[in-house]
């Protein structure tokens, strides 16, 4: 791939197209005044992050024709900690909603959780979800009715959904979501302390519990809540999200945000060029197995 920066290499399927880069480049904070001029190609930084995110590789296993781990992780940590990823998420979400014929901000949202296993690398906030029999972490998601991410919090899997809800809802303000009035959730959010928190901190918002029909056994798709399950499926397209591989919950939350950012970039600027994979070189003779 050759772009205006002079970088030349073979393109990866996760690389940003020119149209996608034009959408996200203005959302990257400029370099701080003073000091040396920025010498890093930020498009390649994003390409490297997206490659790691989609393939699930380790930081040290980034291909040699992408940027080195030290550079990529430095920007990942910077954008994670200075809320750049959160700002990208909000800006792109508003554009996608307008493209879909909606207002830039939602009037309704959905809240739910997903428990995922962690790995042996260690890290903070791990626990056991007795209901789902999973040892690891829990992803608390707030999405709009299109399934677009509004906020995410990652905790130990043992933390009750209703108990963690104020932490999740505090990630967004009434000023950021001025039209929001109702949040759909399941019975776990029928919680006195949660309602008390809402009355004090977010009086404009109410939780509306959506339950399966009486007598339903096992999993049941519930209207107005199923969009969160679809969002979980979108997140699962990236191997980095197949488990929680991160040492910190901040990095785990950032990986969910990156899923949403990548999804919305493809919604706004679809990549219509098919990627061809050559799984077998033309010079390789197929092996014939005798019957």
Report each predicted region and the residues it spans.
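Short alpha-helical elements
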Residues: 1-291
């Amino acid at each position: 791939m050759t772009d205006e920066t002079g970088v030349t290499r073979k393109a990866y399927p996760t690389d940003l197209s020119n149209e996608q880069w034009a959408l996200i480049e203005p959302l990257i904070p400029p370099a701080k005044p003073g000091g040396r001029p920025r010498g890093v190609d930020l498009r390649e930084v994003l390409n490297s992050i997206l490659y790691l995110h989609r393939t699930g590789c380790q930081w040290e296993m980034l291909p040699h024709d992408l940027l080195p781990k030290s550079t990529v992780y430095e920007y990942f940590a910077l954008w994670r900690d200075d809320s750049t990823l959160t700002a990208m998420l909000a800006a792109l979400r508003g554009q996608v909603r307008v493209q879909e014929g909606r207002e830039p901000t939602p009037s309704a949202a959905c809240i739910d959780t997903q428990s995922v296993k962690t790995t042996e690398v260690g890290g903070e906030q791990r626990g056991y979800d007795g209901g789902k029999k999973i040892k690891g972490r829990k992803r608390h998601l707030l999405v709009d009715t299109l399934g677009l991410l509004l906020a995410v919090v990652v905790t130990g899997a043992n933390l009750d959904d209703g108990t963690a809800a104020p932490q999740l809802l505090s990630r967004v303000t009434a000023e950021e979501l001025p039209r929001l009035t109702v949040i759909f959730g399941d019975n776990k959010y029928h919680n006195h302390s949660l309602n008390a928190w809402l009355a004090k901190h977010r009086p404009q918002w109410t939780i509306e519990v959506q339950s399966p029909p009486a007598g339903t056994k096992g999993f049941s798709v519930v209207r107005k809540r199923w969009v969160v399950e679809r969002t979980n499926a979108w997140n699962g397209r990236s191997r980095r999200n197949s488990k929680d591989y991160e040492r910190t919950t901040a990095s785990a939350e950032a990986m969910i945000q990156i899923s949403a950012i990548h999804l919305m970039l493809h919604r706004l600027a679809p990549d219509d060029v098919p990627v061809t994979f050559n799984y077998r070189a033309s010079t390789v003779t197929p092996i014939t197995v005798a019957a």
